[in-house]
Amino acid sequence: QRVIRKGGTYRARVRMRNGTMAWSHWSPPVEFVAGEPDLAGLRAGLVFNEIMYNPLGQAGVSAGEFEFLELKNIGESTLDLSGLFFSSGISFIFPEGSMLASGELFLLGINRAALQSRYPGLVVNGIFEGKLANEGEAITLSAGIGAPVLSVAYDDAAPWPEQADGQGFSLAADR
């Protein structure tokens, strides 16, 4: 059950805590109509750039510790990823202030130390929960109450490249 329904009219009042943790007075009521978020910029500019779903392991570190997913902003404007979340596949919520400038990458992994030992200098922006399915799956990034922003379905069978299935290679966007 949703708390707020699209098209519904609502009134809200807010208060906040200041730096000394004292509460402010309540604001005057504000009336609004709930609508869909504007996702056009995100949908046009954000892509799955690389997916390492079935990596090779190494001595003392299981293969799954090297999984990662990389997003890229291919648009011309900075994108605000704050509050976006994965509604299928892995589990991760982008924290407030997650901005992605044009051309920048945002890499999520399972184990920061393992990834940085294999790829020195790699910036790991966040740690996801769960695991990328070695047999393939759909990964969906969503906003708000679940509006899809970006989705990809990969597989470990043709026409997908076999080298990405446990042979040390990742799936990379073809642009």
Feature-to-residue mapping (PLM):
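Recognizes extended acidic, P/S/T-rich segments that occur
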Residues: 1-7
